Amino acid sequence: MIGTRVGGSGSTEIVQANQPQPSAAVAQAHPHAVSPSSNPPLTASQSAAQAPESSAAGAARLPVAPRHLPTLEKFRAEQPTVQGTSTPTISANAALLIGSLLQSEKLPFEVMAARLSPERYALQQFHGSDLQQMLGRFAEPGHLPGKAETEQLIKGFARSLADQLEHFQLMHDATAEAFGPGGLRDRNTLAVSQAALGEYAGRASKSIEAGLNHSLAVLDERIAALDSQLEGATEDSRPVLLMDRQALETARAMLSDLHVDFCKSPEAKRLSAVAAHTQMDALIDKLNVDRSSVGGWKGIGPIVAAAVPQFMVSMLHLGYIRTATSDAMKDAVPEKSADASMKRALAVGLTAGVAHEGVTNLLKPMVQAGFQKAGLNERLNMVPLKGIDTDSVIPDPFELKNDNGALVRKTPEEAAEDKAFVASERAVLNQKKVQVSSTHPLGEMIPYGAFGGGQAVRQMLNDFNLLNGQTLSARAVTSGIAGAISATTQTIAQLNSTYVDPRGRKIPVFTPDRANADLGKDLAKGLDLREPAVRTAFYSKAVSGVQSAALNGALPSVAVQPQGASGTLSAGNIMRNMALAATGSVSYLSTLYANQSVTAEAKALKEAGMGGATPMVARTETALSNIRHPDRASLPHTFQPDTLGGVPRAVENAYHMARGALQLPTQVVVDTVRVVEDGVASGVSSLRDAHKPAETSSPTADDAAAVELTAMEEGRRR
């Protein structure tokens, strides 16, 4: 329910497309039909109340609250269309009256709307519609409708339904805008109507897809039934059954294509967006309630849920595995060897990079599943946080608008302006979602500060002889603590992150993720090497690990006390050692984080129409774009171009260019490996096909049926 519902002035008329309800019953009613029949059975009095009745006759018996009788009189005096035209008017009274009716009697929204004015507010219903009847014909051999005709009817029904939903939402908006400073009781009444409209819109927006799914299920049942009949069919009945089965298979293929096409269509997207507008109040209330469940001291749960697994993975892959490998290579490769640096970088980088990806994707899902298994997610709120769905909070703008009480379609200029506004608001929200992550310039400072600061403190304590900070465990535990601090800081920032929509409503950007963990699926997401995306992630982390190790190895060694000397280092050497320890940690992480964000940046670049022309080198293309076009909108930005004369944005752009420079060497190698991998896989497949022996197996049942059907048809033609 953002401000983009209503644009400027326009003159295009909207003609309501209420389909007449056919009297013929449909053989199989859809189980999720958008109609009163999908609700609990109506009582006798309720059923009688649904009989067609004129507005004038029914208005006298409307059970509205006494305080709403003057509003009812105003509604009766309204004109349904703009004088002298067929353009519908938007009533500022109807929504309140529907809410009043719903407070007196619990009925579906569409029933109450029609009761208020059957001439004006007879809402679209899938059940009993021409569309449902046409879909029913797919299960009748010999009565298959045309694909183009069906597609046109589906999209026409969807457009008409979306127009009606927009009309009703604009009606509710008009009522809300008419309220004065008071009117709390009426606002509650309007909220009842708004909630009921959202519930109806949720059913209605899904009715077409559900109807298509239902028809596909019916076809599957019919085909299965024919298969059973064919098993015991006689020679006389078999040809007819085969023809019926072939007809149903053809119908199913066509219906499946229609289903896929509709789900991807602008009409389906518009229906989802309109439904999101009608459900916005309920969604925001739910998001705030969910956010309150981890508010205050309860926020310790999400903090622990983030800090504990991060402590474990950082201690293991950055601490023990990377440090142990580095120490082992120092002993194995002589310092004076000409290629010592390269050998160490390869060994340490490959090991640490693969460990970083593998350990993270192994331990984090296991720890979260463990929290759920122990019930800590319910008792102590130990749940992760997830970003809210941007499109649900900021849906696409309406195509219709309220033009001084008239329902008209926006002009192309108004529609383009509203879409641009929505895009800008989504960009703001998306920035907030990534602002504290390691893929954002500011977000990266959190782990840099935690890990760099942790290693600096460890080095300082070692140089002051307060502990032996050079042991494997000391360095590993420091990495673990730094990881926990980083995760804690990020979670606290997420718990306090809010987005203010154009209507001034505060919406939490992150919400608790209380979904039941599926450990098998969660592990497969990051560890199933059969998936190309998983392999690419490992390639990227391994190669970037080598690059990180090479950069880290180029740093000078820390100063140490001469052999046999006592006391501590000078203050200057201690400060130098602390700086080197911090720099070493940051130099190692910077390449990992830069390359970690390539996948998301490549996707955003493609969606913006600036990349993806050559899929095999998409990652290299992304790195180059970060160097050449750091100011593009698809990259995360904290500052606007005009903030403080553009200086902060220029610094941010330089940062993106540096990230691109770190990404480029790694991603060139990754893309090369992917090309080689695809070439090898293609070659092996071709070789296997070339040496595959000719098959002489008997035809399958489907093949036999097709042969018999063809022979039968040829016999008829003779």
Swiss-Prot record:
* Chain intervals for the UniProt region annotation (Disordered): 1-63, 683-718
Q: Provide this UniProt record's keywords sorted from A to Z.
A: Host membrane, Membrane, Secreted, Virulence
- Comp. bias (Gly residues): 1-10
Top-level taxon of the source organism: Bacteria
Compositionally skewed regions (Polar residues) per UniProt: 11-22
Please give the function described in this protein's UniProt entry: Involved in the suppression of basal resistance and promotion of disease symptoms in plants. May be involved in the inhibition of a host vesicle trafficking pathway.
Record text on subunit structure and interactions? Interacts with the chaperone ShcM.
Q: What is this protein called?
A: Effector protein hopM1
Q: What species is given as this protein's source?
A: Pseudomonas syringae pv. syringae (strain B728a)
